[in-house]
Amino acid sequence: MYLPKEKEIIQIKSYKHNGKLHRTWKKTVVLKSTENIIIGGNDHTLVVEADGRKWVTREPSICYFHSDYWFNVISMIREDGIYHYCNLGTPFAVDEQALKYIDYDLDIKVFPDGRFHLLDEGEYEQHRRQMKYPDSIDRILRHNVDVLSHWILDKKGPFSPDYIDIWYEKYKEYR
């Protein structure tokens, strides 16, 4: 399996269950790269939507991807605190072109005070019917919502108090 090196610039591409490209983040700096975990950082990076619309992220963020879990976490560093946006999707795959995953619509937004909300359940149900997500995928995703909720409550992984300090410092050093 190809693994990007630390300091390497990669693209992140999300797809939908039907194989169509959903969104591309053009530049993310690799901060950590192992077979199980890739952590990246970006700031004001260009994002291209499947329909061609383009926008630029507003703040620095640290991105966490794991090969064993069906979610990834984007931690956005804002003036009023850290916001985490958690995408429910497949574990990552990576090649020379990009880090890739399938986005399954469900998201969890975590606020600086620790409150969190599950988002986009209607979109998930609509796409589940349209793209015929198998029941096995639904079970995996529901289980990973539970795992992710426990990580948030237990301040594990990207939700630990030191996570942002450590990885944002490394990002500032590498960029």
UniProtKB/Swiss-Prot annotation:
UniProt name for this protein: Nucleoside triphosphate/diphosphate phosphatase
Residues that hold Mg(2+) 1 according to the record: N87, D103, D107
EC id: 3.6.1.15, 3.6.1.6
Active site: R23
NCBIfam families found in the cross-reference section: PRK13662.1
Gene3D superfamilies: FomD-like
Chain's role: Has nucleoside phosphatase activity towards nucleoside triphosphates and nucleoside diphosphates.
Similarity comment: family membership: Belongs to the Ntdp family.
One MF term in the entry's GO annotations: ribonucleoside triphosphate phosphatase activity
Cofactor: Mg(2+)
Alphabetized InterPro entries for the sequence: DUF402 (IPR007295), FomD-like_sf (IPR035930), Ntdp-like (IPR050212), SA1684 (IPR016882)
Annotated positions binding Mg(2+) 2: D105, D107, D120, E123
Domain of life, per lineage: Bacteria
Top-level class of the enzyme under EC nomenclature: hydrolase
Keywords for the protein's UniProt record, in alphabetical order: Hydrolase, Magnesium, Metal-binding
Reactions accelerated catalytically: a ribonucleoside 5'-triphosphate + H2O = a ribonucleoside 5'-diphosphate + phosphate + H(+); a ribonucleoside 5'-diphosphate + H2O = a ribonucleoside 5'-phosphate + phosphate + H(+)
Upper classification of the organism: Bacteria, Bacillati, Bacillota, Bacilli, Bacillales
